[in-house]
Amino acid sequence: MNASALPHMHPSRSFQGLILTLHSYWAAQGCVILQPYDMEVGAGTFHPATTLRSLGPRPWNAAYVQPSRRPKDGRYGENPNRLQHYYQYQVILKPNPPNLQELYLGSLAAIGLDPLLHDIRFVEDDWESPTLGAWGLGWECWCDGMEVSQFTYFQQVCGIECAPVSGELTYGLERLAMYVQGVDNVYDLNFNGLEGSDKVTYGEVFLQAEQEYSRHNFEYANTEMLFRHFEDAERECRALLEAGAPRPSDNAALHRMVFPAYDQCIKASHVFNLLDARGVISVTERQSYILRVRDLAKACGEAFLNTEAGGATLATAA
């Protein structure tokens, strides 16, 4: 559906119209439009369409919305622009196109931020994800003095060098929508673009959940259970990687259990974030948990390179 054909779906009027416009723009650039990954992740980068697909030589262009959870960022629904659950729009372009910045500026123009009418600036801000063992050269994009998105040239993911380098674009959808709609409180965002009794706001959709999950994240999440869940996820990740690894009798077969194993890595990461929000992990323990998750991510990344999607074949695996 073309959002521009429906006035109430224009990005300046509706949150969902903003998403549809970005979908339309990046589909026109040749991206596969994917759905959100169905697990609790801290950022769109955790989606295997980015983390795993950025590895290996095969070209890959995709875009998707990803609900993201950062338990420590909850403010019981009382902060106008800080949330423990929010939405990112993620674009991964591999290999990195030479006109990435031009494509990005085109996406801003598509949602109504004409670079000729707004002060668009790129501020150097290299990106790093310790739990994913990932980093890249990056820039924040500021529009009229407010950060609206970031783009990064991946150098490493899962502790593995990216060859070729991928270009990643990340839009904070709530912040971008607040700017486009001209509102100061995220809960006042018009979600569906309608008015009067038909209007649905962001707060009507998400405020109660934000309040309840803040209580859960800071006060009620069962820490004994979470510690067990972390151990279980870590153990299962390694067990699945072992189960899917080629055997000598397989005649150099490819790895067969990467995605289920990576799901367990994602689970371990989210459980760690909940434990961190509950304040039950010391400073020294925190670093240890980060390293444990990173080790899982690295093992998954290495296994992915021994799959067809990762660029391997039976001939290269031999």
From Swiss-Prot:
GO terms for biological process: glycyl-tRNA aminoacylation. InterPro entries: aa-tRNA-synth_II/BPL/LPL, Gly-tRNA-synth_heterodimer, Gly-tRNA_ligase_asu. One of its GO terms (cellular component) is cytosol. It comes from the Bacteria. Its main location: cytoplasm. Disulfide bonds: none annotated. The keyword ATP-binding applies. PROSITE patterns: AA_TRNA_LIGASE_II_GLYAB. The keyword Signal does not apply. Its EC number is 6.1.1.14. It is found in: Cytoplasm. GO terms for molecular function: ATP binding; glycine-tRNA ligase activity. Keywords: Aminoacyl-tRNA synthetase, ATP-binding, Cytoplasm, Ligase, Nucleotide-binding, Protein biosynthesis. Belongs to the class-II aminoacyl-tRNA synthetase family. HAMAP family: Gly_tRNA_synth_alpha. NCBIfam families: glyQ, PRK09348.1. Tetramer of two alpha and two beta subunits. This is Glycine--tRNA ligase alpha subunit. It comes from Chelativorans sp. (strain BNC1).
